[in-house]
């Protein structure tokens, strides 16, 4: 109880400095009481695209300013039942679109790991990662579409876990791209991530993409008896764009793992080279469809100051979207138009399937969804970097993105492939390099095996 109250006491000052929360639960301290529940008195931050009855849900967008949901998301209900105390709704890139945490109606989130200068916290779950890094929550929920939990975790030197697609309910999560969106968990250590995941890992009949119980039973059989891991190092995710200093630190970690008996193998997933292209064909197309509902009638609000008498009815509402969201709506609608649908969208779907099949071919476990046969000589996990470099300053990131939005899209190059395949991934801090993460990836549904491996990697870095 004392620790929870201390975190909540520090919250206003941290929020003022780093712009972490869009709204704060003013009664949180009164909710701290003796508890023996699984997450009793653990303080949590909820990303502002996960609906809550008692706090506004805005997606950091002017379109949803002040919106109050009539219900709680399933994950919020589960956390409440487990005894967690909600501190507030965390800042984010508008509707989850961005990798820097700067595209917010409420202003950019700053990185508590770099207090000496204004530095980006990563996106889109910027506020969730910043809340963990600032020490004002024990853990936070984010959403990961193409790296939105893992990238901020790397930039803030915290842990960010994206479960397998379908393991955690999306009911009550405001969609960006529904075939990719996954609720993720951020914390300081893997052990706490595991505790939270155990609470959230269950079938939800309200979510049509929730993994059914029969597949969860198959997933429970994915257990390793051996102590040492076979670790694959994907050649496509360790290229020349990575700074020499980061490569050197990564090699130190690999040497330590090998010294402890883990086996390292070079592997190749050639389809990774198409991942960014595929992602930006599919995700904006889904976003364009999802955001069409914000018409000022069912959802959203109208800008009464605009004289749009000669324009379309919904223009005053659509005008409240930020620049990045507008860019992706335009791109998504183009990819869905008659001329581009066959050449862009459908080809991207085929390339996505090819990527999934190639990932399946290098893992020792089978993919319980695709039915692809396991590779007896395959690896247990993949190890790569989460990002190419430490986080840039706010000024540098903004300047680079202003020159071309494509510059920021490249930040997702190491995280997007796993999202397209629906694989479980986790980013843990790289020892000796503040603001850089190691990314571990396992076969679909092997989430607990992945968490075991992540604990091993973190422990070996301490030795």
UniProtKB/Swiss-Prot annotation:
EC number: 6.3.5.7
GO terms for cellular component: glutamyl-tRNA(Gln) amidotransferase complex; mitochondrion
Disulfide partners: none
Alphabetized UniProt keyword annotations: ATP-binding, Ligase, Mitochondrion, Nucleotide-binding, Protein biosynthesis
Catalytic activity field: L-glutamyl-tRNA(Gln) + L-glutamine + ATP + H2O = L-glutaminyl-tRNA(Gln) + L-glutamate + ADP + phosphate + H(+)
Enzyme class: ligase
InterPro entries registered for this protein in UniProt: Amidase, Amidase_CS, Amidase_dom, AS_sf, GatA
Keyword Calcium set for record: no
Subcellular location(s) per record: Mitochondrion
Keyword Mitochondrion: yes
Active-site residues, record numbering mapped to chain: 47, 124, 148
Main location: mitochondrion
GO molecular function: ATP binding; glutaminyl-tRNA synthase (glutamine-hydrolyzing) activity
Name of one Pfam family that matches: Amidase
Similarity section: Belongs to the amidase family. GatA subfamily.
Function description: Allows the formation of correctly charged Gln-tRNA(Gln) through the transamidation of misacylated Glu-tRNA(Gln) in the mitochondria. The reaction takes place in the presence of glutamine and ATP through an activated gamma-phospho-Glu-tRNA(Gln).
Cited PANTHER family: GLUTAMYL-TRNA(GLN) AMIDOTRANSFERASE SUBUNIT A, MITOCHONDRIAL, TRANSAMIDASE
Subunit comment: Subunit of the heterotrimeric GatFAB amidotransferase (AdT) complex, composed of A, B and F subunits.
Name this protein carries in UniProt: Glutamyl-tRNA(Gln) amidotransferase subunit A, mitochondrial
Organism: Eremothecium gossypii (strain ATCC 10895 / CBS 109.51 / FGSC 9923 / NRRL Y-1056)
């Amino acid at each position: 109880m004392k620790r929870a109250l201390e975190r909540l006491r520090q919250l206003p000052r941290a929020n003022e400095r780093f712009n972490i929360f869009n709204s704060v639960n003013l009664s949180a301290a009164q909710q701290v009481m003796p508890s023996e529940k699984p997450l009793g008195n653990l303080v949590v931050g909820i990303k502002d695209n996960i609906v809550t009855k008692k706090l506004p849900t805005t997606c950091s967008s002017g379109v949803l300013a002040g919106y109050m949901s009539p219900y709680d998301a399933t994950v919020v209900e589960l956390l409440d039942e487990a005894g967690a105390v909600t501190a507030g709704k965390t800042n984010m890139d508008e509707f989850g679109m961005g990798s820097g945490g700067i595209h917010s109606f409420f202003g950019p989130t700053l990185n508590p790991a770099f207090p000496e200068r204004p530095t980006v916290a990563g996106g889109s779950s910027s506020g969730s990662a910043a809340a963990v890094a600032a020490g004002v929550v024990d853990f936070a929920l984010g959403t990961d579409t193409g790296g939105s939990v893992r990238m901020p975790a790397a930039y803030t030197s915290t842990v960010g876990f994206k479960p397998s697609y379908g393991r955690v309910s999306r009911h009550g999560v405001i969609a960006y791209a529904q075939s990719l969106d996954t609720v993720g968990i951020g914390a300081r250590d893997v052990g706490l991530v595991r505790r939270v995941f155990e609470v959230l890992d269950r079938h939800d009949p309200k979510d049509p993409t929730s993994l059914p119980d029969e597949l969860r039973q198959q997933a429970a059989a994915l257990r390793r008896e051996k102590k040492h891991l076979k670790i694959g190092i994907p050649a496509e995710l360790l290229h020349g764009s990575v700074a020499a200093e980061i490569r050197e630190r990564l090699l130190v970690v690999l040497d330590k793992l090998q010294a402890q008996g883990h086996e390292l193998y070079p592997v190749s997933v050639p389809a990774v080279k198409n991942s960014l292209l595929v992602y930006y064909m599919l995700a904006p197309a889904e976003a364009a469809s999802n955001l069409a509902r914000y018409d000022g009638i069912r959802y959203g609000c109208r800008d009464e100051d605009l004289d749009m008498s000669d324009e379309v009815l919904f223009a005053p509402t659509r005008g409240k979207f930020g620049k990045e969201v507008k860019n992706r709506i335009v791109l998504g609608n183009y990819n869905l138009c008659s001329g581009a649908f066959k050449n862009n969208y459908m080809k991207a779907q085929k390339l996505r399937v090819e990527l999934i099949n190639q990932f399946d071919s290098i893992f020792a476990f089978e993919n319980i969804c695709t039915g692809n046969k396991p590779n007896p000589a395959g690896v247990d996990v993949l190890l790569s970097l989460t990002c190419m470099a430490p986080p840039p300053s706010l000024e540098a990131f903004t300047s680079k993105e202003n020159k071309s939005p494509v510059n920021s899209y490249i930040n997702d190059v190491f995280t997007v492939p796993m999202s397209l395949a629906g694989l479980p991934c986790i980013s843990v801090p790289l020892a000796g390099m503040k603001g850089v993460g190691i990314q571990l990836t396992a076969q679909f549904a092997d989430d607990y095996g992945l968490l075991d491996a992540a604990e091993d990697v973190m422990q070996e870095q301490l030795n």
